[in-house]
Every structure is written in C-alpha cells, then in structure tokens.
Amino acid sequence: GNCNLRCEWCDTNFDEYEQKSVDEIMQEINSYDCKNIVFTGGEPMLNDLWPLARTLKHDGYHLSIESNGTIAIPEGLIDWICISPKDQMYPNVSIKQRTGDELKCVYVGQSLDMYEPLKQGFSHLFLQPCYDENATVEENGRGFALTEAVVKAHPEWRLSLQTHKWMGIL
C-alpha cells in the first residue's frame, strides 16, 4: 500500500506489497469462508478499488474502508466508512470525507475540540491510544491511561485498541 501521509506510528509496510489483478485477489479471497472485507493501509483511496469493490459487492460481500479522509469516497459501494484523520500530525491537511459510520482518532494528547466540526457527520466516535513500537511498555501504558481518562471525561467517545500491537502480532 501507499499513503499520502505516512504517519510514524502506522503499521503498514510501504516497501513490501504486491500488485495483483482483480481475478488474483478474488481467487485469494474465495479461499476463505468470510464475507466481510476491509480496505485499509496505507491510504486505500490512492488505489483504483472500484473494479474489485463492484466484483465483491456482486458476490455478496460486506465492504468497509478505513481512510485518512483526504480523498472523498464515492457513494454506493462501501457499506461501512471509517475515517481516521491525522489532524494532530498534519493540521494543514484538508479532510474531504466528512461523513461516515466511524470517526477514529489516534490520541497523542491533542484537544478533542479539533474534531468538533467533523464529528457531527459520524455515528460512532473512537479514540485510539498511539502505540509506539520503540517505546517501553510503561510509556505505551501511560498513553493508554491518558486516552482512557479522556474517554471517561468525554462519554460520546469510545476507546479503541490495536490489540494486535499490544500482543506483538504485527
């Protein structure tokens, strides 16, 4: 995958990915007993997803996308839209996708006021503590505790964890 932001905490390996045709991807997908597909990492909107998305929808798949929101998502094919803006790192980047199902913000201590104009377009609000692979368990734990305290003080937000990182899976 590729991304137009490349945040330092991202778990996407931008150097190792393989281009495949829709047929090759569908062959791989059909080998699994699953009907839920998530387009993610880096920034999926930089790719031409629509031929694959149309094929998946035709075959009965539920489609979700996680995007940084800098590119508008066409209506009609995606069932669940998660926007994860990076305003805290890139304050001058314009968010083009201002509606969706889920607003997920990586929390690094920024004021939640910055999301006021944006959060009205979403039905679910999530704060995710920033997990730093180079930090100690204690440092990451402090980030988690800070995020948890902010969520408790702002009950319209929910806590979101990247459990795979905490477990050392990726």
Q: What kind of region is each of these model predictions?
A:
Residues G1, E16, K104-V106, E138:
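Short N-terminal micro-motifs specific to bacterial/archaeal maturation
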Residues G1-D79:
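Conserved Radical SAM active-site core
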Residues S31-C34, Q110-L170:
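Auxiliary Fe-S-binding modules of radical SAM enzymes
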